[in-house]
Amino acid sequence: MADFDYETFDYSDGLDENGYWSGIKALDYVTLPEDFGSIALKESDLTPTEDELQQQMDSLLNQYTASQPVTGRAAQSGDVANIDYTGTVDGVAFTGGTATGYDLTLGSGTFIDGFEDQIIGHNVGDTFDVTVTFPDGYGDSTDAEGNTITLSGKEAVFSVTLNSLSESVTPELTDEWVESNFGISDGLHTADQLRSYFSDALYANNYDNAIVDYLMANSTFKELPAEITSYYIRMFLNHYNQYATAYSMDLNAFAQTQGYTSADAMLAASDAYFEHLTKQDLIFQAVAEAKSLAPTQEELDDANSTYADTYGENRAHLNALQACVLDWLEENATVA
């Protein structure tokens, strides 16, 4: 982990203005299958199954869940508990350990391990203690006078009052619900129309995946350029370091909350992921090199307006290049 400068990571690092990896000729690293320009796919592999379609519909409905108060029972996993809490370590209150009217989804893992579990089973109006242990590496805090309080590895006691409970209710898929939510914006008026819309979207996604999977399985690679693999390692570490910082942890402490012994162990477990991303980028660039493909200015402008503010122009141009390559591959593929 120490070998990678992840704190200053920039999404456009190592990319040129064309969306290519700077100084890298992809065709020197990957040999594409002879039929890459005429990939044959099976219709049965692209058509979504009923299970896939139902998962999409369920996911959509879950986005429209509404909250309603819970009465007459104790707190359960999945409930949103509105709580007041005050935390102490060795009997001393610490900064960041007190809140009023905080909404906490039980079972979400938002708080320190064990905190949410100890709320489950309590009723609205209860006041009780929750005892947890901060993970090793957890950042220090201060007391009311500004004195440092060490939290790493320390036991903390939180006095918690359960103010209220609420639960999410998922709507049913009906023509009326579709009309109300998608009639004007998307021109969808019935449940059958909505299902057809998602079926088409899944088919298109399966098409994309089938093309990429075929090329990944049938291309041969020499050694992978360290510049690309390092880029994705730095991106990975930067991403999780932001989470760790938000919770006043270092990367090692955060990795432990994810079930790893250290950040290096978390990194090692992701080696195949970094290799996959590197190979995929090489394939897209190799096709672009072999067929002299490039996005239009309009496509570059669209990519810039969507991605450049967050990822920089060069990364936006890589996205546009890969979309251009995928379009070409799909136009030249056959489905039977």
Task: Briefly describe each language-model feature range.
Residues 1-336:
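FKBP-type peptidyl-prolyl cis-trans isomerases
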